[in-house]
C-alpha cells in the first residue's frame, strides 16, 4: 500500500493528523489550524523513513510497519528482557522490555494465535526531560475496509500552510 492515516490525540487533548495519500505527506494540527506538506516517496516504508529521518517528525510506531523490523530492532535495542506474563484488558500478554543507546521501550504482546501489540511505551533517552510515548492498542483489524474518503484530506476552513520545521533550517 502507498497510503497511511495517523490520527493522534495527545494527553492534553490536542489532535493531529498525518496523512500519506500516495502523492504527498500532510501533517495537520487541527487545534492550531495549520498544516505542512511534502512530497511522498512511493512506498509507505520509504515514506515513513523520510518522515522520521528527513522531516524529523515523530512516528513512534513506524517500526511496527517496517518489513525490516527483525533487522532494525536489534540495532536499536542493546538489551531485551522478558519481564512477565500479565493481563491487559482481560487478555494475557507477554511484557518485554528493551534498552538502547537512544531509546528504551516496553511492549506487551497478546498471547495466542494473534500475537499483536496491546501496549507500547517508548522513552526517548537523549531528549531533554526524556519524554515518553505510550499507546494502548485495541480493536485490531488486520483486514480493514476503507471508505473512499479515508485518505482524502479535508482541511479546516482558513487552515494556514506552514513549512515543516526542518525546511526552515535548510540553506
Which ranges hold each PLM region?
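An acidic-aromatic
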Residues: 1-59, 129-133
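Gly/Pro-enriched, hydrophobic low-complexity segments
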Residues: 11, 26-27, 75-164, 168
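Solvent-exposed helix/loop surface patches that form functional interfaces
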Residues: 42-79, 83
Amino acid at each position: 500500500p502507498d497510503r497511511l492515516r495517523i490520527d493522534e490525540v495527545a494527553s492534553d487533548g490536542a489532535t493531529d493528523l498525518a496523512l500519506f495519500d500516495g502523492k504527498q505527506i500532510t501533517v495537520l494540527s487541527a487545534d492550531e489550524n495549520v498544516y505542512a506538506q511534502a512530497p511522498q516517496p512511493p512506498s509507505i516504508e520509504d515514506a515513513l523513513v523520510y518522515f522520521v529521518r528527513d522531516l524529523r517528525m515523530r512516528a513512534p510506531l513506524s517500526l511496527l510497519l517496517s518489513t525490516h523490523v527483525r533487522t532494525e530492532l536489534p540495532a536499536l535495542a542493546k538489551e531485551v528482557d522478558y519481564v512477565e506474563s500479565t493481563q491487559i484488558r482481560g487478555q494475557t500478554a507477554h511484557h518485554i522490555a528493551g534498552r538502547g543507546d537512544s531509546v528504551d521501550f516496553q511492549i506487551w504482546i497478546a498471547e495466542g494465535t494473534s500475537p499483536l501489540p496491546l501496549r507500547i511505551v517508548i522513552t526517548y533517552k537523549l531528549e531533554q526531560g526524556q519524554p515518553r510515548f505510550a499507546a494502548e492498542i485495541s480493536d485490531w483489524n488486520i483486514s480493514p475496509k476503507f471508505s473512499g474518503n479515508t485518505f482524502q484530506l479535508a482541511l479546516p476552513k482558513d487552515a494556514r500552510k506552514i513549512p515543516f520545521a526542518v525546511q526552515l533550517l535548510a540553506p
